[in-house]
Amino acid sequence: HVITAHEQGAAHAADGYARATGKVGVVLATSGPGATNLVTGIATAYLDSIPMVAITGNVPNSLIGRDSFQEVDITGITMPITKHNFFVKRIEDLADTVRTAFQIAKSGRPGPVLVDIPKDVQNAMYEYTPAPVVEPNPVPPVEESLLDEAAAMIEAAKRPYLYIGGGAITDDAGAEVETLADKIDAPIGCTMMGLSAVPNSNPRFLGMEGMHGHYASSISQNEADLIITAGCRFSDRGTGNTQKYARNAKIIHIDIDASELHKNIPADLGLTGSMKEILSKLCQKVQQQQHPEWMARIEELKAYTAKLEAQ
């Protein structure tokens, strides 16, 4: 394990480890201020869908609710910024709780889970029973009829645009993004969380869009007649004024979390499931497309962007 000078640094280190490896990051902290110092790191992991398990200490069960030294309701504090959290009252429940925490952190849309353990439970003795590794819950497949509808929308489009977020990295779907873009002759833009999913060397890749992004990516998104959005939540950094966002485009929104569909931008079609699987199936369903006028316009925008950046 790695000891840090401050718990906030430990939380961000666990977050960074999870981003770099795809594995669950783990952070441990003492009760009271140690636990509350984790909050910013936990919130970061929650908003960016990063798998993390935070394990905190607390006062003994007998002192809970008495405003004891370094007693903090850390489960209550972190409820809005965790996928789930646990307060372990009995030693008999500890092993299964930790296993479940790791399962929740990696299942579906990843995120942080907190396990709060009172001091008397930490000091208790109990016979450990080995158990199989708990795998993440499987993601249900998308209905074929919805995939067929998406394929029909793609084939009807004249100016398609692929817009990807961090889900492309989480689901290791970069190759599927590139394959679909080639199949439907579309440019690729991304959110900040989607950077590195597609290499900058790909001629279709326009970079990050939005207020902090590239001109070509933002303008082409607003000129598109179909936006295929996958693994992102349409945050305000990318959309700007939602009433004026891509007014001429139909939208297909793909996300593993159904609650993200239609939340910020209404979609003409929402698909809930694995981004990698959905894009792979769409590649099989759509016919090869050619959009020479659209791609010529994309090249114009890329050239103008390069000119702006050179100034």
Q: What positions do the PLM features span?
A:
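Short internal beta-strands
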Residues: A54-T56, L114-D116, D185-M192, I252-D255
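Phosphate/diphosphate-binding loops
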Residues: G210-L261
